[in-house]
């Protein structure tokens, strides 16, 4: 809902739109044109993109400004090593001409760092896209914190990356792992403040 601050957005006031940007149903709010370009670019082309998440966290934006990108220095990085795409900043994302470039940059990956901009993830479900985003943002947070504390940060070895990926693949349990974590977080939100609904 364009015009609401982030803490005012609830599940019930989200604005539904079609791929042409037309609002479906009733809403007193419009949509963010830049958000529409980014989300619709992926939804139009990526067949299994049931959910696209795009955020501007401090850590994600800070890391998106670093030429080196995401380094493999923690367990979070090890699990997603080689699975993060990058898209160069072209200015505020308001133009249809950027849509095919976004899709080309993403390729077959599910996570993308929009350089000088933020983070994006794609999932076959809301829980899957959220899980990818949580891991990607967490990796950014830790890299920014570690490099702020010291220039002597240890990289993760190739064998540890391979072992981490193998262990994670064994835990995936199809989509159920992401669903379990997502549902646990929903229960937590319900306990704290159910007004998000």
Regions found by a protein language model. Give the residues of each.
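Glycine-rich flexible loops
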Residues: 1-197
């Amino acid at each position: 809902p364009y015009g609401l601050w982030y803490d005012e957005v609830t599940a019930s006031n989200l604005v539904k739109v079609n791929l042409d940007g037309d609002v479906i149903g009733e809403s007193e709010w419009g949509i963010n044109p830049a958000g529409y370009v980014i989300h619709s670019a992926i939804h139009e082309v990526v067949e299994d993109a049931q959910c696209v998440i795009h955020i501007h966290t401090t850590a994600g934006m800070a890391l998106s400004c670093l030429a080196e990108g995401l380094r493999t220095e923690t367990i979070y990085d090890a699990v997603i090593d080689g699975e993060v795409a990058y898209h160069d900043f072209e200015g505020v994302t308001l133009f249809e001409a950027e849509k095919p470039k976004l899709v080309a940059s993403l390729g077959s990956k599910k996570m993308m760092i929009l350089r000088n901009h933020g983070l994006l993830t794609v999932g076959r479900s809301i829980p899957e896209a959220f899980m990818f985003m949580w891991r990607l943002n967490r990796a950014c947070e830790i890299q920014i914190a570690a490099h702020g504390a010291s220039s002597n940060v240890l990289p993760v070895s190739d064998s540890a990356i391979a072992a981490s990926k193998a262990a994670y693949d064994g835990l995936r349990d199809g989509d159920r792992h992401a669903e379990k974590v997502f549902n646990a977080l929903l229960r937590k939100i319900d306990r704290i403040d159910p007004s998000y609904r």
